[in-house]
Amino acid sequence: MSSPISVHEVAKRADLLGQLSYPHGDPRYSLEALQALERIGVEAITLDKRGLLKLLGKGFRNIVLEGVMAGERVAVKIRRSDYVSRDASREATMHGIANRLGVGPRLLGWCGPVLVVELVPGPDLSTWLATGGYAPAEARETLLELALQCFRLDRGGLDHGELSDARRHVLVVGGRPVIIDFGSARITPRPKNLTSILSYLSGGNLGGVRGLLGLRTPHREALRRYKENPSEEQFVDLMRMVGLLEG
């Protein structure tokens, strides 16, 4: 892997500068993103083996690059130039709320179209579950921690909005689940984070994993009770029902 290139040096490379305004390669937008990186305090962007900016991910809202800030590797999210809004302030607000609830990678800064968060160097949840290499008790502990994080979001009134597809939104590092990407999150009186994750775990693609871990599908009535009253008692009942808690 090539060494990181300073943000100042990126400005001198038209090929790299163009990557900052994916997919249009708009010079003005690239400079806006570059200035935002400097204001936040990002020192450098990592290059890949081809000598281009290292792309960690690409969604309909952002591209994600690997950067360096205060000497640490970070994830740099830059709004796509074709997205309806080039302002990352709303996502930063939702991410900050999640952090205060003890959920998500640390938000390190944002400015204009750029948002910088703690880098989470782990596989997505589906890959982690499918790859194996863990004891069933360890995996159940990981899933219970994920459920607890969803419960905290529910109690805090923040709905992630995309957890029914945890492949893209939950990473696992050393057995610890990390919920990422709060771009679709919203404040609502009836969040559905826990029920979304339980729906994902009940999907057909994870039938083998459920059998290995001894997990069960929750009853609709129990899900309905939790939605109406996401109390600790209802949470514990659900966890016992699906097999993540004993008793």
Predicted regions and their residues:
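Conserved structural core of kinase catalytic domains
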Residues: G96, V103-L144
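ATP-binding glycine-rich loop module of kinase domains
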Residues: S30, A36-R90
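Hydrophobic residue at the +6 position relative to the catalytic HRD Asp in the kinase catalytic loop
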Residues: A166-V172
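A conserved alpha-helical element in kinase catalytic cores
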Residues: I78-C111, E141, L201, N205
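C-lobe/activation-segment region of protein kinase-like
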Residues: E162, V173-G247
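Juxta-kinase regulatory segment immediately upstream of eukaryotic protein kinase catalytic domains
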Residues: M1-L53, L238-E246
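Protein kinase catalytic-loop region centered on the HRD/HxD motif
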Residues: L148-H160
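Active-site beta-strand termini and strand-to-loop segments that position acidic
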Residues: E66-A70, E118-L119, V172-G174
